[in-house]
Amino acid sequence: MNNGTLGAPPRVVVDAVTEHARRVAATYPPRVSWDDVKSSLAGLIGGDPEGFVFPRNTTEAMNFVANGLDLPDGAEVLSTDHEHIGGLEPWKLVTRRRALPLRTVSLPAPAASSEELLEAVWSGVTDRTRVVCVSHITFTTGTILPITELSARCAARDIVLAVDGAHPPGMIQMDLNTLGGDFYASSPHKWLLAPQGTGLLYIAEPWREKLWPTLASGGWDDMTLGAHRFNHMGTMDESRIAGLLAATEFFHALGMQRVEGRVRYLRGMLQDGLMHIPGLSLATPSDNALNAAMVSFRIDGVESLDLQAHLSRAAKVRTRVIGEYDYGWMRLSTHIYNSPGDVARVLELLDDAARNGVPARDGRP
């Protein structure tokens, strides 16, 4: 139940990757249609097909953004204390190199409303803020931030909004055409169940011509290519792109309304059960509009890393401990291949752990 880190690709995705790799090894390398991938992806998560770039993951995508902007002297970058290192470290690098301030605001956990989250982020904006970098859905608690409202405020102040969207594609219905923001970085290897090494970056107009490439190869300065000039990275393994196309087609066949309904149903079952476990406190909002398919919590008197090891040994349950920022929460994810039986079993294990404790993980006294 750690789909928030890595999804389990369906057979059609694995077959697409291996078949492409087999053909490359046997014959002249076949080409993957970039246009097909872009169109399929746009049909799934919205956006202009010409705005998509395919780096290896969210980390690389956000590095493209941070390194490609011409930030003026004295500019400030604003982020939060719920950002993944993959989305935040590029800004740490750029601001340290340029001797620019990187400001951080605290987000409530659990959050009570979208308005509370919006005002928490906006409280850090100053006259010098030039970039706001936040998550669409936080990796820490699964909280959904009000990106559309934040985008409107940023646009009114000529502030660049860079969104870490590692989780939403494949989890919830979304439309990049109406969501807002200047840049949207994601990792389809999570909820979209694409192969590892498939990332995406959506670049809104007019940034397709204004952003500097981080990797320069043939065509990097050909503005007629638009965002596609960022896909010119030299020789690359296109089998992962074949797998990404197969993954998007798989989700088209399922329908994102069905997918979101499934993951929300399982998460609701999980969260409702967690609320009845003694000594357990939730960091994920109770408002259904503020979360979708991840739940984070802590059990009094139980070390989350010990609990993680216990769940793995006892039932082969894979989890994620949020050790970043010293939060110490355990995070569980629910995806389409999980079942109500999976949820019931993990709730049983957690209830027993809360009442009886768990052994220390290996290597600890």
Question: Each predicted region: which residue ranges?
Answer:
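Pyridoxal 5′-phosphate
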Residues: 1-365
